[in-house]
Structure formats: structure tokens, C-alpha cells
A protein has these predicted regions:
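Hydrophobic alpha-helical segments at protein termini of multi-pass membrane proteins
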Residues: 39-43, 47-49, 56-78, 185-189, ...
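Structural preference for beta-strand elements that scaffold enzyme active sites
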Residues: 9-21, 49-52, 93-97, 155-158, ...
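Catalytic domains of carbohydrate-active enzymes, especially glycoside hydrolases
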Residues: 17, 28-61, 82-99
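Active-site-adjacent "subsite" loops/lids of carbohydrate-active enzymes
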Residues: 78-89, 96-142, 169-171
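Noncatalytic carbohydrate-binding groove/subsite architecture in carbohydrate-active enzymes
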Residues: 96-100, 129-137, 142-161, 167-219
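The substrate-binding groove and active-site-proximal loops of carbohydrate-active enzymes
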Residues: 23-30, 65-75, 118-136, 177-183
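Active-site beta-loop-alpha junctions enriched in small/polar residues
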Residues: 20-27, 56-58, 101-103, 161-163, ...
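Mature N-terminal, pre-catalytic/accessory segment of carbohydrate-active enzymes
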Residues: 1-32, 46
């Protein structure tokens, strides 16, 4: 006979058995809820205990079409002041994969235009100022997750969209990678990793985890 308490203690009950999906680039919805909330609910209804979505300065123009709030100037403020983002973070998901891009790294594009380099600042090199600003923003956001979801059992994986295309922002895979961009992206990734590690070192928490990951696709 299987003992349910033993299953829970061994973590089997929270293992991610379901092949999941992500709520990025959704094109339609059926309810009055925001795109982010509706798609998160449907992913949960599919049986998934993992939600993958994005958090970045384009929250009001890309993917979810959430209302712009000038008070939202960081990832932490996006997590606390934007109701739909807070709602999905509070949902009953065990695992979160989140593409995070710092507000401190963003150069707004002209209205109606999209430039994927606008959210990263390591093309052709990475300045110390942007590095320091990114560290603080990711450190603060990680601290927020650890404090807010302390004891929840949630696991957060903070990462990036397809990193290969950050190295080749012109989408030409036949060209050699710019060595300065490669070094810049390496510093960018290490900064994010260090910010998360330091926040975990400096905060008291239990039964909640935050990890850094790097996503690639040209493999």
C-alpha cells in the first residue's frame, strides 16, 4: 500500500510529470481576464504544475498587453504592482520558469517597433554601470521571491530567452560571433548568477528555491 505522506515527503507528489507549454506569444483569449492570467489558468487546468512566462519592461506592449504603470520600474515592482503578474506568481504552481530582463537595461523602442537588443546591453561589450544596475535589480527580485514565498515549496528558475539569438542579434547564424558580445554576454550571465547566489546567501528562507539558468536553442 502506498502511503500518501511518504509520497509527499519524498517529493513524488510534486514531481513535474506533465509535458508542459508556456504562455509567451499568445494570440487570443476567451475571457475578460488578462492574457497572462487566462493562459496560466488553462495551463494549470491541463494538469501542469509548471508555469513558464516572461517578466520584462515590455510587459505592457509584448505578450500580455497589460496596462502601463509608470510606477513599475524594476522586476520587483512588476511582481508587486502589476496585479496579473502577482496573481500568477501566487497561483498553485510548484515550478516557475521565468524569462527575466531588467528595467535597468532597457532602452524603449519607438512606438510600434520592436528591437530585441533594447533589453540587453552587452552587444559589443558590457559596461560596469549596466552590470552594477543589473546585479542590484536581480538581487532585489530574488530577495523578494525568497521572502514572499518563504515556506511555499515553490521553485523559481530565472533565465533568458533563446540566448543564441542574443549573440547573433541580426539572426544570421553564418557569421562568427562578435568576441566583444560573447564576453559581454558572459559577464551578463555571471552577474545574474552572482546576484541570485548572493541573495540566497543573505536571506533567511525555507522551502522555497531560486535558481539561474541559461536558455539556448541552436544546439
Amino acid at each position: 500500500k502506498i502511503d500518501q505522506n511518504e509520497i509527499n515527503e519524498n517529493g513524488v507528489a510534486t514531481y513535474n510529470f506533465a509535458i508542459g507549454t508556456q504562455t509567451v506569444g499568445s494570440k487570443y483569449k476567451f475571457t475578460d481576464e488578462s492574457m497572462l492570467v487566462e493562459t496560466a489558468r488553462e495551463i494549470k487546468n491541463m494538469g501542469s504544475n509548471l508555469l513558464k512566462f516572461s517578466m520584462h519592461p515590455r510587459y505592457c506592449t509584448e505578450n500580455y498587453g497589460l496596462p502601463k504603470n509608470v510606477a513599475i520600474t524594476s522586476l520587483t515592482k512588476l511582481a508587486t504592482l502589476e496585479p496579473s503578474v502577482k496573481e500568477v506568481l501566487d497561483m498553485d504552481f510548484k515550478y516557475y520558469h521565468i524569462w527575466i530582463y531588467g528595467f535597468s537595461q532597457y532602452t524603449p523602442e519607438p512606438e510600434g517597433e520592436k528591437d530585441d537588443t533594447a533589453q540587453i546591453k552587452f552587444i559589443n561589450g558590457y559596461s560596469k554601470k549596466y552590470e552594477d544596475d543589473l546585479y542590484k535589480e536581480v538581487y532585489d527580485f530574488t530577495s523578494h521571491l525568497l521572502k514572499t514565498y518563504n515556506g511555499s515549496g515553490k521553485v523559481f528558475y530565472l533565465g533568458n530567452w533563446e540566448g543564441d539569438w542574443h549573440l547573433r542579434s541580426d539572426y544570421d547564424r553564418t557569421k562568427p560571433v562578435n568576441p566583444k558580445t560573447l564576453k559581454g554576454m558572459t559577464r551578463w550571465a555571471k552577474t545574474r548568477q552572482k546576484a541570485i547566489d548572493d541573495a540566497k546567501r543573505d536571506n533567511n528562507y525555507k522551502n522555497v528555491e531560486v535558481y539561474h539558468y541559461i536558455e539556448v536553442n541552436l544546439v
